[in-house]
């Protein structure tokens, strides 16, 4: 791991090998950190909502701020019709955020640095939003691909572009998160090794750069969770509030 910056992304088995036919379903480090992230979320918000005192403690304050933040994001992006989906958006944001943050711990594993994880999340969102769109609007949901005010001569081309854009949503959503997390952690590993090499000559400048880069990566971890959640809200808004 010290010499290969890509080694940190390796998935390895924890415990005995378990197979279902030809499919390996063994418990891995990826499964471990997804479970740890989920348990951490449950514990924090369970303790944060247990007392519900007038003067909140730090955990309760964190829970209340998180609730208000996501609630406002949904209202501003998808409107009041999206309120029934608050629990899903909230859980999605927190899961991605905690997976990103746990990946910042040395010798841990960044779940969201693997395209299969981010693509499954994005595909689930894409399928769910599409189903909601047809349930709410029937075949009128297809109006999403027919922008108003487009000249008839350009309409076939615009419809094709809109359909391709719609079908590429899970790809763009998953690749954005995966690429940013993998690139950020790779850069941190490479730069960290560079700082260790410079340690023989001393100096605070390389260490300061490492601290600054770590702070930047923490910010990126939050922003990527936010972008993932807000794009989900935008897609949900298209399904609930057709404006074409």
Predicted regions and their residues:
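Selective transmembrane helix interface/packing segments
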Residues: 1-244
């Amino acid at each position: 791991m010290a010499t290969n910056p890509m080694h940190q992304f390796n998935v390895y088995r924890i415990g005995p090998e378990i197979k279902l036919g030809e499919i390996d379903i063994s418990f891995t480090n990826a499964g471990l950190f997804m479970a740890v992230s989920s348990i951490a979320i449950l514990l924090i918000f369970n303790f944060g909502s247990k007392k519900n005192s007038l003067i909140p403690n730090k955990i309760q304050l964190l829970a209340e701020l998180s609730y208000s933040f996501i609630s406002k994001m949904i209202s501003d992006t998808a409107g009041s019709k999206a309120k029934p989906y608050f629990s899903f958006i909230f859980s999605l944001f927190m899961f991605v955020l905690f997976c990103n943050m746990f990946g910042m711990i040395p010798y841990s594993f960044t779940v969201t640095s693997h395209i299969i994880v981010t693509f499954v999340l994005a595909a689930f969102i894409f399928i769910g939003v599409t189903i909601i769109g047809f349930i709410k609007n029937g075949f009128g949901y297809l109006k999403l691909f027919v922008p108003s005010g487009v000249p008839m001569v350009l309409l076939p081309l615009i419809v094709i572009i809109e359909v391709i854009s719609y079908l590429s949503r899970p790809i763009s959503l998953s690749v954005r998160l995966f690429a940013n997390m993998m690139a950020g952690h790779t850069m941190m590993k490479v730069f960290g090794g560079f700082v260790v090499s410079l340690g023989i000559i001393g100096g605070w400048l390389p260490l300061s750069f490492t601290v600054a880069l770590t702070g930047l990566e923490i910010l990126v971890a939050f922003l990527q969770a936010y972008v993932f959640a807000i794009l989900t809200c935008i897609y949900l808004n298209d399904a609930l509030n057709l404006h074409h």
